[in-house]
Amino acid sequence: MLASSPPLTGRLSGLKPTAVNAILAEVREHQSQAGAKPLVSLMRGEPDLKTPAHIVEACTRALRDGRTSYPDNRGEKPLREAVALKLERDNGLRFDAATEVLATTGATFGIYAALMALIEEGAEVLLPDPIYDAYQSPIRLAGGRIKSVAARISGGRFAIDEDALEAAWSPAVRALILNTPWNPVGTVLDREELAAVARFCERRNVALISDEIYEAITYGGHPHLSPLAIAPGLRERSVLINSLSKTYAMTGWRVGYCAGPAPLIQAMYLVLAQSSRGPATFIQDAAAAALAGPQDCVTEMREEYSQRREQVLARLAGIPKVAMLPPDGGFFAMADVRGLNLPSNEIRRRLMRDHGVVVVHGAAYGPGGEGTLRVSFASGGETLTRGLDRLREGLSACL
């Protein structure tokens, strides 16, 4: 008698792959076909830059020194102190390293732990639309429901305002996840927009989960401002989430951090201690070296991304019925393709099938993203040059 698989829990029924993972499955299928054109990917948020040498050296030194035992699950003291130093230095925020900082295995787990600590079964979580789709599964795993906040394209950028937040609110809303710089659209929320968010959260007693992972990658006079620094009253109802993946090209290191009021951080610690535990000890040593060490590498990376951004905007300029939305931050640019009168997913598929370039269709990020394409410049050099050539050719062919 053949053994059958054990029954699976219903809590997984609402989970689905992220847009990037779903497209990767299509890419693998395409590449398995005989005679398929090799593809160039302008899809993923995976920097092609290397982790700076002094950070790598801190890790290897920790390994040589035998720093391979279980870590402090709250975060090793040097890392928590480096996080507190960084937040005061860069964001003007003071947190107690002992009670208000938590180290995590990447920012995504920090968001999951925050949701587990903040929302009950059936609670609603607000997400600005277009939505970074990796937020959706942690909300569902925590028993929550997603409520989108409609954004609008205004002045060449996506924006949200207090009216949109109010329109999305209901008595079941418990939290808002805010991402600035905003993946996928590249908007850096300004002081006025953040003040509106703060007023809304305070008026409606909504907790703020502030995802600031792209904070170091901003352009053209659009500096990152943490919502917690804009409105001091927001601090007691907010948790700041960040990681080292983008700022220091450390995606594979899987290390992030959270900062917030001590009771919330303690609750998040309980989630972490019973699941992922903390990042490896030697990884934490490298992270502390990154945050507390020289920051020249951050400036150099930002300058490199700025040059790539200009390359994207220049190469895709002047295509009839296509308009680029220049990003304020991050390493994604949105192409407004509403003038082509085709669904964004159809355009994406044509670009891959007929022109050998992979991007993400805006509709993958919610109804607010329909009519756009997300173009990544996390990779540069020949990959970016060839990809942009193919993208220009493919978009022109859709006319």
Please place each PLM-identified region on the residue numbering.
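N-terminal small-domain helix-loop-helix segment of the aminotransferase-like
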Residues: L2-G106, A113, A290-G293, C398-L399
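Helix C-cap/helix->beta junction micro-motif
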Residues: H30, A34, A142, R203-R204, ...
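Conserved core of the PLP fold type I
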Residues: R67-R199, A216-I217, H224-P232, R390
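PLP-dependent enzyme catalytic core of the Aspartate aminotransferase-like
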Residues: E166-A167, N341-P343, R350-V359, Y365-L399
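Active-site PLP attachment segment
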Residues: I230-A267, P279
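Structural motif of enzymes handling amino- and sulfur-group chemistry
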Residues: A262, P279-Q295, E300-M301
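Structural signature of PLP-dependent enzymes
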Residues: M268-A273, L291-L313, S344
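Conserved glycine-rich beta-strand-loop-beta hairpin in the small C-terminal domain of fold type I
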Residues: A288, E304-L313, M324-V337
